[in-house]
Each structure stands twice: as structure tokens, then as C-alpha cells.
């Protein structure tokens, strides 16, 4: 049984705008899944179905094998935590601590349990010293971390991140990469994220869905998807610079192993130049 599954999911907005068309998706437990595609592909709309923010026009969304209903919606939202692309859409409390505590309090936890979860969540995202800060005075990257802390304080089994690195500087991107790895490894959490940062996909994803015009047009491992540059071009995306360079060298007859992440590319170049066996 998958932690999240959709079956022929369709969503039509007012005006007969088909945002999702027959989406069938599975998220096994303890995996990292990227959903990539151009703006307007339907990624955000899909994510809002994962924890019941939106209801399907047709088709099914199953959480741990069960459809989302009025009776189980609270449990669904404890299971699936959604972080919006713009953190201002979900940060509203006067202090960082109060904002992160909002979810655990509404879960009915006692005061000590709430304090513990808030402390752990802030420590995990590196904001322990920000408890009394006003969230709306923080930088974009700091706000994003507050939003993530507010979700992980509820200890969901699935963390859904809509464009987690959008608007962040390089240091902020590196921090988000570290957090996502930490969540999935330390907590056994399933992480589903969308992004235009294809280098992020190479670093983090174990499986990829490619989306365009409300439909999935391809799916596969990083190697399977990144070996199809024409596919990426068709959805207005491009290979990360390192695998793009290696592909070019290989096409010119240079014997070099393929590499998709920085570490893989480094090893490939060292081998190609005889620096390591």
C-alpha cells in the first residue's frame, strides 16, 4: 500500500479550465519524488489534492489506501504536510514560535508536547535562536524555513514542497537541500517536491514525474529522465550543466562515465583523466 496514490485524477476550474487530466501517481513510503514541468503544468494544483485542500472533479486520491473524506480530513492533514511556494501564504502568527506551534496545538497536544515539537522543528531547520522573531521581518529563505518547521512540527509521514528553492540565494538552496535529505533519512519521511531547479532534482530525487498541460508525459529514475534531453526541452527545461557537459564529451567519443550530481561528475572526470581507478 502506497502512502499516496491518485487514480485518474482530474480537476477542472471554473471556466472549464482542465488543470489535471487523468493523473495516476504513486508515492511509496520513504522516497524522494520530484515533479517537474513548466509554469502552468498543474503541479501546484496536484499538490493541493494530496492533503485535501482541493477536491477532485473526478478520479481518486488515496492516502494510505483510503479516500479523503470529511471524516478523515484532519488525519490526512496530519499525515501529509504541504508547504506552499510562497511562505507568506501560511505564516500568520506574531512570532516564529507561535507560528510553528499552531499545528501541534490544533492537534490537541499538551503544552509540554507542543514545546518539544516546536524546539525540535526549529532546531532541525536551524532557527532555534529565532523563537521570538516576527516572521514577516525575516528573509525569504528564513520564512521558508519557518513554514517548513510549522509542518514538520506536526510530524507528518509525507512532506510536500511546492518550489522549495524559489527565490532563494545559493546558500538558501544548499540549506534546503540539506533539510530535505535530513527529513527523508532521519525521519523516514516521504518527500515530494516540485522545482525548476533541475540540479536540485539530480541531487535529491529518487524518482521523477514530468508534467505538462495537466498530464504526466513521462516518469522514471534520474538516469532515465535525464538521458532524454529532447523530453526536457519539450517542457521548457534543460539538463544541469555537468551532465550536459559530460553528454557532449561522450558524443565526441571521449570515454567518460555519466554523472548527474556534482559528486558523480567529479568522480567521472577524475577517472577519465586517470586520477583514480
Swiss-Prot record:
Protein family membership: Belongs to the ABC transporter superfamily. Energy-coupling factor EcfA family.
Membrane topology, as annotated: Peripheral membrane protein
Matches recorded under NCBIfam families: cbiO, PRK13652.1
GO cellular component: ATP-binding cassette (ABC) transporter complex
Known function: ATP-binding (A) component of a common energy-coupling factor (ECF) ABC-transporter complex. Unlike classic ABC transporters this ECF transporter provides the energy necessary to transport a number of different substrates.
Main EC class the enzyme belongs to: translocase
Protein name: Energy-coupling factor transporter ATP-binding protein EcfA1
Biological process terms in GO annotation: cobalt ion transport
Binding site for ATP: 37-44
Subcellular locations according to the entry: Cell membrane
Xref: CDD domains: ABC_cobalt_CbiO_domain1
Assembly and oligomerization: Forms a stable energy-coupling factor (ECF) transporter complex composed of 2 membrane-embedded substrate-binding proteins (S component), 2 ATP-binding proteins (A component) and 2 transmembrane proteins (T component).
Keywords, ordered alphabetically: ATP-binding, Cell membrane, Membrane, Nucleotide-binding, Translocase, Transport
EC number: 7.-.-.-
